Curated annotation (Swiss-Prot):
<protein>
    <recommendedName>
        <fullName>Serine--tRNA ligase, cytoplasmic</fullName>
        <ecNumber>6.1.1.11</ecNumber>
    </recommendedName>
</protein>
<dbReference type="GO" id="GO:0006434">
    <property type="term" value="P:seryl-tRNA aminoacylation"/>
</dbReference>
<dbReference type="GO" id="GO:0005524">
    <property type="term" value="F:ATP binding"/>
</dbReference>
<feature type="binding site">
    <location>
        <begin position="358"/>
        <end position="361"/>
    </location>
    <ligand>
        <name>ATP</name>
    </ligand>
</feature>
<dbReference type="Pfam" id="PF00587">
    <property type="entry name" value="tRNA-synt_2b"/>
</dbReference>
<dbReference type="InterPro" id="IPR002317">
    <property type="entry name" value="Ser-tRNA-ligase_type_1"/>
</dbReference>
<comment type="subunit">
    <text>Homodimer. The tRNA molecule binds across the dimer.</text>
</comment>
<comment type="function">
    <text>Catalyzes the attachment of serine to tRNA(Ser) in a two-step reaction: serine is first activated by ATP to form Ser-AMP and then transferred to the acceptor end of tRNA(Ser).</text>
</comment>
<dbReference type="InterPro" id="IPR015866">
    <property type="entry name" value="Ser-tRNA-synth_1_N"/>
</dbReference>
<feature type="binding site">
    <location>
        <position position="396"/>
    </location>
    <ligand>
        <name>L-serine</name>
    </ligand>
</feature>
<dbReference type="GO" id="GO:0002181">
    <property type="term" value="P:cytoplasmic translation"/>
</dbReference>
<keyword id="KW-0648">Protein biosynthesis</keyword>
<dbReference type="InterPro" id="IPR006195">
    <property type="entry name" value="aa-tRNA-synth_II"/>
</dbReference>
<dbReference type="GO" id="GO:0004828">
    <property type="term" value="F:serine-tRNA ligase activity"/>
</dbReference>
<dbReference type="InterPro" id="IPR033729">
    <property type="entry name" value="SerRS_core"/>
</dbReference>
<keyword id="KW-0547">Nucleotide-binding</keyword>
<dbReference type="InterPro" id="IPR045864">
    <property type="entry name" value="aa-tRNA-synth_II/BPL/LPL"/>
</dbReference>
């Protein structure tokens, strides 16, 4: 969440910066003034509580003097009891007001970076650059959709998957399994060579931890809840969630020596993905459970934009190594999630659909997450009014099922699928996977793309 001091002019803040950021997001601007008013009410309660504590101390001293002089202190004792009761009520009010205020602050998005294109329409996402392998024709005629290629490889079984697991359930089979595992292992090796620490994350988080790292609407729209007696846990939607909390409550006193910390997170991810998504619902492109390799970096605040560039470059190098055509797009302000100050997506080319689809999201969340999780940096100084928090950044490297879909469409031949060169060592040296099944009569490509 944002720094509460940013709302207070008298503390060096500038609430107009927050208002302008809210306008860019298409979000409520009036909430800024609501926080300012709530802060004043909270300060008033704190002031009253401090005065009550002073009164209690004064009365306590007077009682001591009366007792020492063996005089009647009954009236003072009654006053003390009354003040103590008042203190209790004020503490309850102050705690409730602070919680209410922080809940409102938490609903306000991060400050949108100046370089983000301002729009409420994702059609206005800005194309930063494109890349395609030299000598490769991006357009393919008479090709199959990724789910048809996987069917012909006998690489997955959606019918039995739905039978045992429900909507969008699937079994990966044979080369589907080996392709997926190859992407996982290659992704981890790729990041390990670039200084990342591999981290296999837990797939369930306690409710209080998830509340610090996920947006409120994610609880309703995206996350699966697991209830065990009185305990509530949530299945993770991305390893970013547990890894962001990995260093919660920690303080890096020597950031120049201790930061950055770079993690290659690996986990199965779970998303409810409510509703239909048209072509995205084909095959294993958009499913409820999938594997993902995630980049997560904690850095000194002054170096986070340098890290942002490095992370999107890593993602580009990964897909260049797979020789998949892609483009980088800057996401418009109105489509940013609350934590992100700026986001780039890498969209790869799917020839059957004839369009680019998102494979990577790379975000700089600045100190929005670390403030919630109390991950600080810098030398500890007595009386510091301004806390310094690390900056947190996240980027997909490879959501393996989705990346596999892209590989299948781009590497298909009339007789099977070529294996990308960088994956061949992870596929037992195989360079080509032959088709072993025919398509059903009502398959997608036989119906036409519409």
């Amino acid at each position: 969440m944002l720094d509460i001091n940013l709302f207070q002019v008298e503390k060096g803040g500038n609430p107009e910066i927050i208002r302008e950021s809210q306008r860019k997001r298409g979000a409520d601007v009036g909430v800024v003034d609501k926080v300012i008013e709530m802060y004043k009410e909270w300060v008033s309660l704190r002031f009253e509580l401090d005065n009550t504590n002073k009164s209690i101390n004064r009365v306590q001293k007077e009682i001591g003097l009366k007792m020492k002089a063996k005089e009647d202190a009954s009236e003072l004792l009654e006053e003390k009891n009354s003040l103590t009761e008042r203190k209790k009520n004020l503490i309850e009010q102050e705690t409730a007001k602070n919680k209410e205020m922080l809940n409102v602050v938490s609903s306000i998005g991060n400050i949108v970076h100046d370089s983000v294109p301002v729009s409420m329409d994702e059609d206005n996402n800005e194309i930063i650059r494109k890349w395609a392998p030299e000598g490769v024709t991006v357009e393919k005629k008479n090709c199959l959709s990724h789910h048809e290629v996987l069917t012909r490889l006998d690489g997955y079984d959606p019918e039995r998957g739905v039978k045992v697991s429900g909507h969008r359930g699937y079994f990966l089979r044979q080369y589907g399994v080996f392709f997926n595992l190859a992407l996982i292992q290659y992704g981890l090796d790729f990041l390990e060579k670039r200084g990342y620490i591999a981290l296999q994350a837990p797939t369930m988080l306690n409710k209080d931890v998830m509340a610090k790292t996920a947006q409120l609407e994610q609880f309703d729209e995206e996350l699966y809840k697991v209830i065990d007696g009185d305990e509530e846990r949530y299945l993770i939607a991305t390893s970013e969630q547990p890894i962001s909390a990995y260093h919660s409550g920690e303080w890096f006193e020597k950031p120049s020596e201790q930061l950055p910390l770079k993690y290659a997170g690996y986990s199965t991810c779970y998303r409810r993905e409510a509703g239909s998504h048209g072509r995205d619902a084909w095959g294993i492109f958009r499913v409820h459970a999938f594997e993902k390799i995630e980049q997560f970096v904690l850095t000194d605040p002054e170096k986070s934009w340098e890290a942002f560039t490095e992370m999107i470059n890593h993602a580009e190098d990964f897909y260049k190594s797979l020789e998949l055509p892609y483009r980088i797009v800057a996401i418009v302000s109105g489509a940013l999630n609350n934590a992100a100050a700026k986001k780039y997506d890498l969209e790869a080319w799917f020839p059957f659909q004839g369009e680019y689809k998102e494979l990577v999201s790379c975000s700089n969340c600045t100190d929005y997450q670390s403030r919630n999780l109390e991950i600080r940096c810098g030398v500890k100084k007595m009386g510091d009014r301004e806390k310094k928090y690390v900056h947190c950044l996240n980027s997909t490297l490879c959501a393996t099922e989705r990346a596999l879909c892209c590989i299948l469409e781009n590497y298909q031949t009339p007789d099977g699928v070529n294996v990308p060169k960088v994956l061949q060592p992870y596929m037992g040296g195989k360079t080509f996977l032959p088709f072993t099944k025919e398509l059903p009569k009502n398959s997608t490509s036989k119906k036409g793309k519409n």
